[in-house]
Amino acid sequence: MVYFAGTILFCIFAATLNKRYSMIIGRKEEIAELEKLYHSDRPEFVAIYGRRRVGKTFLIKQALKGRITFQHTGVSPVDQDNEKSRMKTQLESFYYALLNQGLEGYKAPKTWMEAFFLLEQLLQNLDNGERQVVFIDELPWMDTPRSGFLPAFENFWNGWCSGRDNIMLIVCGSATSWILSNLSKNKGGLYGRLTAEIKLSPFTLKECAMYFEHANIQMSQYDILQSYMVFGGIPYYISYFQKGLSFEQNTDKILFGNKPRLKDEFNRLFAAIFNNPEDSKKVVRLLATRHSGFTREEISKATGLPLGGGLSKTLAALVESDFITCYSPYGMPKSTICYKLIDNFCLFWLKYVEENSKDAGFISDNMTSDILKAWHGVAFEEVCWQHIQQIKRALEIGGVKSSLSAWNVRGDENQDGTQIDLLIIRNDNVVNLCEMKFASSPYTISKEEEIRLRHRIEALKATLSPKQTIHLTMITTYGVAYGKHSGIVQKEVTMDSLFE
């Protein structure tokens, strides 16, 4: 009888969880981690970070719906030009949140030390012995210059929260570099205090397909792939898609015309995340001009930003925020580092939106034209890089240790240049030379294309040891068309595999 009652309780609990999470697409690991932390018997200090618009706030509010004791969101610095008034604005907003959630009998705080003392009083008054979740969203925005915010926040955790077993403090931020430097890698009062870090990544192609299905928006894999090439799997962006409209129509409404949904998103994005938005935009604008990227020295020369601490911090912040990545090009000394743009949305914005934002039908009018052809190729390559695990599974090498690289050899008067955008260098002595081709039908390899591919294979072979074998691997939307020149291909990965 006890077992039967327990079974009923478990079924009710499971049904409640399923209902609570029914609105969340993917994020299974993150939800499981939050549940584990919520049910622990110790104080928890959790930092959740990731690119702006990636769904951090939505995840917390849905996963812990009905279980948050206090929540507050920092005020965006966008449109706040007066540095002196920013601290006052943040403190006022925090005080009003305290009042709205039950604080009584206290005047507005003048310092952050006072503000967190008021939060302690509120939590003590609401304490019934159960878990108390304190959720502070966009925490980095609250740390305005010379405000004394960080020492007060340190004191709040070290002096009060850490001694209460039922406290779960969750902080979020789009300014990933702030979260990492001030919380994760803090060398002061918050050193080693985080009990958990959760990095929220953009949706995969599979998760985007799940979202569109959940929203009852009918889209083919081909169009979902194109939407990913534009919006990069950012949930907030694709939430603007409307059913009954094509990919082209939706993209035009979201990005182009007189009243696009994401008007001035590029500038607002950088202003909300970075302390030095103009320097960050300079770097991103430069990286958008060359797919293979630039070295630190090239970036400094082209942007006018001096080599040293300032540029290093800007590059580090962009890398940590997943706008750019750095890699050591194949065949170059390991000390040679290239930085390349990997944010799909920024790439598309700089390539097309800035110059054509008023053209309400830009995508619909140019989808099959040469204007978008070059972008299709570059953007598809980025999507492939973002789905390396799916590609490795399709190649049945998921368990084989490997490294990734790209190879770019500039030609001269004596020899042609060679560019390989993805190499999978495996520990089993096989190198997958990956060619990524976006096409609306099976890709046909011509005689000229076969000659070019053989040249690349021979050029790469000259740099490898005799033990290593090269597998030409075609990654395409609909596969390679069978023909007299397709025999050169060793392995294939199609669009279907990217959705796995």
Model-derived features: positions:
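A cross-kingdom feature that marks ATP-driven nucleic-acid transaction machinery
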Residues: 329-500
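Phosphate-binding site recognition
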Residues: 1-370, 472
